[in-house]
Amino acid sequence: MLYGKKQNAADKFFIVPNAVFRLGLSSGEIVVYSYLMCCEDRKTFQCYPSYKTIGSAVGMSVNTVRKYVQALEKKRLISTEWTMVNTRDGRAQNGNMKYTIRPIQEAIDYYDEMQMKRLYAEAARRRAEEALAKYDAKHRNRAV
């Protein structure tokens, strides 16, 4: 107990799923994702830090943070949505970005799907190369 208050471990630590390390993320993507996980409300899976706040916390520029946020969205780890704020005089103004941490299984499924598409494309390319090589060999022999 610190200063007479019971400390809650959940307020001081957060868990990053092991699967994050098999999704082919760059170090910058992992850092930004980890920061968003640190900030998230554990009940709603949402948080509202600005690009500037994230950048200050992880040592990146606003543009770099934006790039990694877009990459995390594309890889289905997070979803984002702009918020609106009403000013005191009643005008609507852009607020911070709302980040929602998506279930890790969605990202795993998407990653696996993309890997399968790459494998099928690679197999098709190899079959085409083999067919072309056979065709070339067949026609080369006729020309002689």
Across the structure, where does each feature detected by a protein language model lie?
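Charged low-complexity intrinsically disordered patches
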Residues: 1-4, 74, 97-144
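Short, Lys/Arg-enriched N-terminal segment that forms or immediately precedes the first helix
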Residues: 9-24
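Winged helix-turn-helix DNA-binding recognition segment
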Residues: 21-23, 27-29, 38-97
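General helical secondary-structure elements
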Residues: 8, 18, 62, 114, ...
